[in-house]
Swiss-Prot record:
Beta-glucanases participate in the metabolism of beta-glucan, the main structural component of the cell wall. It could also function biosynthetically as a transglycosylase. InterPro entries: Glyco_hydro_5, Glyco_hydro_5_CS, Glycoside_hydrolase_SF, Glycosyl_hydrolase_5. Keywords: Cell wall biogenesis/degradation, Disulfide bond, Glycosidase, Hydrolase, Secreted, Signal, Zymogen. It is found in: Secreted. This is Glucan 1,3-beta-glucosidase 1. The lineage of its organism: Eukaryota, Fungi, Dikarya, Ascomycota, Taphrinomycotina. Its EC number is 3.2.1.58. One of its GO terms (cellular component) is extracellular region.
Amino acid sequence: MLSFTSVFSFFLHALLLKTAFSYVIKRNNPVFDYTSEKVRGVNIGGWLVLENWITPQLFTQFSSMSNPPTDEWGFCEVLGADEAASQLAAHYSSFYTESDFATIASWGVNVLRIPIGYWAFNVVDGEPYVQGQEYWLDQALTWAEQYGLKVWIDLHGVPGSQNGFENSGKTGSIGWQQNDTVTRTLDIITYVANKYTQSQYASVVIGIETVNEPLGYGLDMDQLKQYDLDAYNIVNPLSSSVATIIHDAYVDLSIWDYGVVSPSSYNLVMDVHRYQLYESDECSKTLDDHLSDVCSIGDSIASSPYITVTGEWSGTLADCTIFEEGVDSSTFIGPNSGDISTWTDEYKGAVRLFIETQLDQFERGAGWIYWTAKTGGPSPTWDMGLLIEYGVFPQPFTDRQYSSYCG
């Protein structure tokens, strides 16, 4: 049976379907106005949520094991609570510091997306996670405010796992939407929203993301849309300057057109992630194929009725870094580009053109957030700082060495 809310949202959206930014309700004196400012951001990946390919130095200690852990759940389970807590404390205090935030601000970045797992706020019996991440999130907000950066708080992993990937905290099957996992997640959203919409964070926190990369084809989309509406109804009444960020779940944006969350909703932003490397056929494409795909992505973003930010993307043209494989286990297609100092001018130019084209197309929407600010392994096309150092990522972001590929 349809609820009154879903019926009302359907008819409201039907009236506004052909609109884009012009009908989005303007915020009163917003800290960040997504309808007039472009998000030019970077993710703080691999810090408060472990990803083995970003910080391989934390996972190579398990290399002699027949079934080594690949995620934070396994990391904590194998090491035990005390040793895991000790190693993670050292990681949190060193992988990102205040000087990193100062450097990031100097690049011209205006928004940070900071991933954090549900276990930072809620751990139950049977879950091996250790905590301590919330302290460092608070520290990051202090640094961000000091250097004029705005922040999205991104709930990167939820109970049960929303996608079965290591970035959710636990690799394997998708267990979210089973038992009490959604209720637990909404309780965490309530805690995060109540805390980070308080006045001391008003000048820095501009978004709370309900869940990172829920895998649409492995979930009940109606339940996901209802969850996003419930989360929106938690966050939105608390602040006029903190947007609710929802992820597109890797389904066509048109599938959201008749969801329970209307694109005209006050303070609502759609997050899309666009990579071209996680399947073998994508890795083997020519540069022209990749660029043409970017043009098509730009068309989709520009036609979306949602305020749309490309919240993850990279300059990576090949699936080629330690611990990082595609969804279909595609790997090592294309040049082994792990040492940027060995790149030819031709390859640098190809990556630069790919990045420039994505910047142009993603700004047809509300902007972009690169994945990621830095890595601890041989992954230069994922490392914004390294790309900037070698002149592959534009500085300033509007600088262009190539004419527009998409016309």
